[in-house]
Amino acid sequence: MSRNIIRPAPGNKVLLVLDDATNHKLLGARERSGRTKTNEVLVRLRDHLNRFPDFYNLDAIKEGAEETDSIIKDL
């Protein structure tokens, strides 16, 4: 089975398994922000996707980085 086939996801939920270092950083960010761990992940993922909408296109990355006044204000 090829992993390069892109299929639509059946839903809008994601399960993440984090390594200890990443989890520790996320817990620290959660404490500093006062958000739940889930909301902290959501804010950070949205921000990343807005900053880097086309991760494999360097021109889009530069444009996205200029437009990042950002999602954190929206929440």
UniProtKB/Swiss-Prot annotation:
The gene is traY. Pfam families: TraY. Its main location: cytoplasm. Part of the relaxosome, a complex composed of plasmid encoded TraI, TraM, TraY and host-encoded IHF bound to the F plasmid origin of transfer (oriT). Interacts with TraM, probably through its C-terminus. Keywords: Activator, Conjugation, Cytoplasm, DNA-binding, Plasmid, Transcription, Transcription regulation. It comes from the Bacteria. One of its GO terms (molecular function) is DNA binding. It is found in: Cytoplasm. NCBIfam families: PRK13740.1-1. This is Relaxosome protein TraY. Conjugative DNA transfer (CDT) is the unidirectional transfer of ssDNA plasmid from a donor to a recipient cell. It is the central mechanism by which antibiotic resistance and virulence factors are propagated in bacterial populations. Part of the relaxosome, which facilitates a site- and strand-specific cut in the origin of transfer by TraI, at the nic site. Relaxosome formation requires binding of IHF and TraY to the oriT region, which then facilitates binding of TraI. Also positively regulates tra gene expression. GO terms for cellular component: cytoplasm. Belongs to the TraY family.
